[in-house]
From Swiss-Prot:
It comes from Streptococcus suis (strain 05ZYH33). Heterotrimer of A, B and C subunits. PANTHER family: GLUTAMYL-TRNA GLN AMIDOTRANSFERASE SUBUNIT B MITOCHONDRIAL AND PROKARYOTIC PET112-RELATED, GLUTAMYL-TRNA(GLN) AMIDOTRANSFERASE SUBUNIT B, MITOCHONDRIAL. Allows the formation of correctly charged Asn-tRNA(Asn) or Gln-tRNA(Gln) through the transamidation of misacylated Asp-tRNA(Asn) or Glu-tRNA(Gln) in organisms which lack either or both of asparaginyl-tRNA or glutaminyl-tRNA synthetases. The reaction takes place in the presence of glutamine and ATP through an activated phospho-Asp-tRNA(Asn) or phospho-Glu-tRNA(Gln). Keywords: ATP-binding, Ligase, Nucleotide-binding, Protein biosynthesis. Its EC number is 6.3.5.-. InterPro entries: Asn/Gln-tRNA_amidoTrfase_suB/E (IPR017959), Asn/Gln-tRNA_Trfase_suB/E_cat (IPR006075), Asn/Gln_amidotransferase (IPR018027), Asn/Gln_tRNA_amidoTrase-B-like (IPR003789), GatB (IPR004413), GatB_C_1 (IPR042114), GatB_Yqey_C_2 (IPR023168), Gln-tRNA_amidoTrfase_suB_CS (IPR017958). GO terms for molecular function: asparaginyl-tRNA synthase (glutamine-hydrolyzing) activity; ATP binding; glutaminyl-tRNA synthase (glutamine-hydrolyzing) activity. The gene is gatB. Belongs to the GatB/GatE family. GatB subfamily. It catalyses: L-glutamyl-tRNA(Gln) + L-glutamine + ATP + H2O = L-glutaminyl-tRNA(Gln) + L-glutamate + ADP + phosphate + H(+); L-aspartyl-tRNA(Asn) + L-glutamine + ATP + H2O = L-asparaginyl-tRNA(Asn) + L-glutamate + ADP + phosphate + 2 H(+). It comes from the Bacteria. This is Aspartyl/glutamyl-tRNA(Asn/Gln) amidotransferase subunit B. One of its GO terms (biological process) is translation.
Amino acid sequence: MNFETIIGLEVHVELNTNSKIFSPSSAHFGEDPNANTNVIDWSFPGVLPVLNKGVVDAGIKAALALNMDIHKDMHFDRKNYFYPDNPKAYQISQFDEPIGYNGWIEIELEDGSTKKIRIERAHLEEDAGKNTHGTDGYSYVDLNRQGVPLIEIVSEADMRSPEEAYAYLTALKEIIQYTGISDVKMEEGSMRVDANISLRPYGQEKFGTKTELKNLNSFNYVRKGLQHEVERQAKILRSGGQIQQETRRYDESTGETILMRVKEGSADYRYFPEPDLPLYEIDDSWIEEVRAELPVFPKARRAHYVENLGLTAYDAGQLTSTKALSDFFEAAVAAGGDAKQVSNWLQGEVAQFLNAEGKTIEQIALTPENLVEMIALIADGTISSKIAKKVFVHLAKEGGSAKAYVEKAGLVQISDPAVLIPIIHQVFADNEAAVADFKSGKRNADKAFTGFLMKATKGQANPQVAQQLLAQELAKLLD
């Protein structure tokens, strides 16, 4: 019997506000344990939460970006559970009326076609703290993360393969990153994924019993974990067994999923409205104010790059991989740069430099205008492509005008025959053996002189002019 795979994803995205959702403590990542806490985070008796407006702004922005309806009368709920990293013994979340609902995004499939994935809801909530179990026999609680704002984005079970789940996550991350509400760095925990998966015989409408997968620390692990779960569940069903509703974790060392616990239902959390927070009204003017801040999203940018700027689909995809890179490219084109040349530099020397330095485009000193200026210096023969690489490194590290640096550093390309011919004659005088080889007809002997000339001019000889003059002067040696 063959089975259809049914997948839905729950994605927690950490919002990059300066302070936490209900307290004034810093939400910054990477501080010393418990440095970013106060009495609200520690749940001291009598303290009351105060909602951070910036979190609601981010929630509205996410909902709009994901084509969602917005609950204009918004409230919060208590999700009750006990764990050491949760000192209140409940989490403030949203249950029956999330900030966003009934949304969708479009994903691109391997064959180039597209598919719409529905999004059931997006709700705001606070993160929990972090437990660390030491080798000394003690467990330690760090509440820096307690109260950091999250938005949980819950898809419908519309994905039919691990590959579709991977494509959905890629598209979702791209959209969220473009809104600016999160850096969506999985390695820092600002994007976390739980997957729900079940199988059913083809033709059956009713979903099978699902399992939830956790410990999915990368999109690749999501794909691998889901693939293993497809195989595990299919094997059980084909042998006449039944799937248990449970939570499993993915073990990257074995490539298998391992049982964690029997899955709880929402009734186990005893949700009820949060009594310490009021009902919040999100009016149309607030929504439109946030809508005005939305950027042009990657799909539209890629279409523009291909249809109007003449780039390939591949180049367009690379340039829109981050909003910062796409913005840089567009600014360079607006400054007069040729789209293809700018694209080549960004995907070539610039990308190599960023990878080597471990930086992003906005973290270096290079500006779009300076890159365009440097490309123009190549085009008009002021510098060679080889010298341009040196100029670029300087601009990336120090910034400033490309033209000013080229002139100050003496990097202007030598194209004047009156300057180059005497240097060529000196090269002949300094390399008598090579001259003798050339005169005797030794194969490829003439090619050595190109290297000699470039060395003598410290790479500043115009390659095309140099080749022409070398051929001319070498011919005279045979007269």
